[in-house]
Regions:
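Phosphate- and other anionic-substrate recognition elements at nucleic-acid/protein interfaces
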Residues: 1-163
Length: 163
């Protein structure tokens, strides 16, 4: 019997970062929004190192951001780069997937907008239903819980592409 790798998926955003810690898509260890204040590189890296110490992951999954279509702030790009640097120091394999990769995977399940992806994820993980944000209007900021769905989408994209 093979042992599943411990996977940590991190999706930095304006509130901190969405995260999922799992062995497989069906074996979730922990997930949520890690509020990071102040929003500084050092605080994000501290949180990453805490997760690594606590869960001992064998794989790190991050948002890719080099595609022309990806809109990402310099702050988030720097945080992702710092996560990569820390994972490399610890010889942890890193997998990165862009928003385009995520959309391509979820298009097969009925939609590729953030809202449609979130609805698909809640159909697979009913325990996330209370976190499900309403459809966002252009005049509203992104819902606090969307980071959880972003992290789940990233984790599921990894398993879909790699398996």
């Amino acid at each position: 019997m093979s042992v599943s790798p411990m996977v940590i998926t991190l999706y930095p955003n304006a509130f901190g970062m969405g995260y999922v810690i799992s062995e497989t898509p069906k074996e979730l260890i922990n997930y949520g929004i890690a509020r990071v204040r102040p929003l500084s590189k050092n605080h994000y890296v501290k949180r990453l190192l805490y997760y690594i110490k606590q869960y001992r992951p064998t794989i790190v999954i991050l948002r890719g951001y080099r595609d022309e279509d990806n809109r990402i702030s310099k702050r988030v790009a720097n945080i992702i780069q710092n996560f990569e640097n820390e994972a490399e120091k610890l010889n942890l394999p890193i997998f990165k997937y862009s928003r385009e990769d995520i959309k391509e995977v979820f298009k097969q399940f009925g939609g590729n907008s953030k809202y449609a992806i979130s609805k698909t994820i809640t159909s697979w993980y009913p325990e996330l239903q209370p976190r499900m944000p309403d459809i966002r209007k252009n005049t509203k900021a992104e819902h606090y819980q969307m980071g959880v769905f972003d992290a789940f989408a990233l984790m599921l994209t990894h398993y879909y592409i790699e398996n």
